[in-house]
């Protein structure tokens, strides 16, 4: 098959993050994007491209040139098998180097500054991402994702459905079979035959199956399989069931008191779970205050971590909750929020639930932001919150940070299974990526309810101790931190 496309135009499937890279390469190669098919988005997308229909519409476009932009290997395979008899073309950057002796199949992505060297073979529907190098005599199967800056030595054989993480190295003469995930920065020094997740240098297997990491009930069935098709949400009475509400707090006593005073007003609707990262104010002030709320039954549970592990506290608390008490049959919805918010609409819970139930393709609803105290002068990156999103009638399609995130509990469990399987952490950017690029669903935010971000008031003062702490410890957000915690509960 020809390495480069002879088509003058192409249709794309799915409008996610990887699609933007694909669009850049096709347009740089002079290939017109005739339209994009996506089940969850409409209208204009990136660089003037248009979403013109849903995936089922592709049956009307048989024999036309197509490219699937999905990053997930399994979903890419499913789409390739269900859209009918289209012509799958390759997307190859002009800035990639491919030896004339290389044999390439169909539906492959080869990104900028990547290299495929002498006598190598690349099957179908693979992603060779930016800066990756496949040296001589490699044999690559189908539906693999070779992430940016991966280096693969000579005579390596890679099967199907593998993910080789960013900046990984695969030594020469290695076999990587099927359904293997290699973590970022790993070094593969011997062949990997058993499916699973491998990390480190040299890489070692850390988990056998995706579902092993996050199981809950005594029969040990993975929740991912047991509850994904749960129909209990169809009963509108579930709207009145209590909602577990995870609130993460840290250090700032006045802000914590304002936030928890706000949320505890709704404890007839919320089972409030406070998560605290230990700080200098914990023992003297914060812990006594939170324990008083617990004793008065204004909150349900209190996780106290012995160190400041940033957003990993969400991750560890949710892991524990899923294994012990977060039952989707009892709690159809779960709320997760930062502990520095107040919300200006007393009906904010109902608004978020109504948004979730108005469209089955909505994955998460969150509160919009009150930007009146946005610290744009001291934190220029905060300007990202000024974006307006797309007005969809009763909601705005757009993401936020972790500002009152409402999800179906089954989706929280599904998300945690995914994050654990990829050795990732609970971050808003990763939730957004999973929402759009794996679930093909929508992140919605409220039109009426707005969250006031109390910490932003502090960020306006660069000399404030909390602002300095955030600046000095910003690197911690990228660290996989863990520690022990105490759990206090009613």
Swiss-Prot record:
Pfam families noted in UniProt: PglD_N (PF17836)
Keyword Signal annotated: yes
Domain of life: Viruses
Annotated signal peptide: 1-19
Family: Belongs to the mimivirus L137 family.
Name the UniProt record assigns to this protein: Uncharacterized protein L142
Disulfide bonds: none
Source organism: Acanthamoeba polyphaga mimivirus
InterPro entries: AcTrfase_PglD-like (IPR020019), Nucleotide-diphossugar_trans (IPR029044), PglD_N (IPR041561), Trans_hexapeptide_repeat (IPR050179), Trimer_LpxA-like_sf (IPR011004)
Keywords for this protein: Signal
């Amino acid at each position: 098959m020809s390495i480069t496309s002879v088509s003058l135009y192409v249709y794309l499937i799915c409008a996610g993050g990887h699609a933007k890279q694909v669009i850049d390469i096709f347009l740089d190669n002079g290939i017109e994007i005739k339209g994009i098919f996506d089940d969850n988005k409409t209208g204009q997308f990136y660089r003037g491209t248009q979403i013109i229909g849903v995936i089922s519409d592709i049956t009307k476009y048989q024999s036309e040139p197509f490219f699937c932009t999905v990053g997930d290997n399994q979903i890419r395979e499913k789409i390739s098998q269900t859209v009918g008899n289209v012509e799958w073309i390759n997307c190859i950057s002009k800035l990639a180097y491919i030896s004339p002796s290389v044999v390439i199949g169909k539906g492959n992505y080869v990104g900028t500054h990547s290299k495929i060297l002498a006598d190598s073979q690349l099957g179908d529907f693979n992603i060779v991402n930016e800066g990756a190098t496949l040296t001589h005599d490699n044999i690559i199967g189908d539906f693999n994702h070779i992430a940016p800056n991966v280096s693969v030595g000579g005579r390596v054989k890679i099967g199907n459905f593998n993910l080789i993480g960013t900046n990984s190295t695969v030594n020469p003469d290695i076999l990587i079979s099927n359904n293997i995930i290699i973590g970022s920065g790993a070094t593969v020094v011997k062949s990997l035959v058993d499916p699973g997740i491998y990390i480190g240098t040299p890489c070692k297997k850390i988990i056998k199956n995706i579902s092993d990491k996050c199981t809950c009930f005594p029969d040990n069935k993975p929740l991912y399989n047991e509850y994904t098709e749960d129909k209990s949400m169809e009963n509108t009475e579930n709207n009145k069931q209590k909602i577990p509400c995870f609130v993460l707090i840290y250090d700032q006593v006045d802000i914590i008191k304002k936030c928890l005073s706000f949320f505890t007003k709704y404890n007839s609707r919320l089972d409030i779970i406070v998560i605290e990262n230990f700080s200098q104010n914990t023992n003297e002030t914060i812990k006594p205050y939170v324990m008083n709320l617990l004793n008065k039954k204004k909150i349900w549970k209190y996780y106290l971590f012995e160190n400041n592990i940033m957003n990993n506290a969400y991750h560890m608390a949710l892991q524990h909750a899923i294994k012990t008490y977060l039952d989707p049959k009892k709690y159809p919805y779960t709320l997760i929020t930062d502990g520095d918010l107040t919300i200006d609409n007393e009906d904010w819970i109902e608004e978020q639930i109504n948004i979730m139930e108005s469209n089955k393709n909505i994955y998460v609803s969150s509160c919009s932001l009150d930007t009146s105290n946005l610290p744009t002068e001291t934190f220029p990156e905060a300007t990202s919150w000024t974006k307006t999103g797309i007005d969809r009638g009763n909601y705005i399609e757009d993401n936020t940070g972790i500002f009152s995130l409402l999800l179906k509990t089954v989706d929280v469990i599904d998300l945690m299974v995914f994050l654990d399987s990829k050795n990732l952490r609970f971050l808003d950017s990763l939730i957004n990526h999973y929402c759009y690029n794996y679930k093909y669903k929508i992140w919605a935010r409220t039109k009426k309810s707005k969250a006031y971000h109390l910490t932003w008031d502090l960020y306006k003062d660069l000399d404030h101790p909390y602002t300095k702490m955030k600046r000095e410890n910003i690197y911690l957000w990228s660290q996989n931190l863990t520690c022990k915690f105490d759990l206090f509960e009613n």
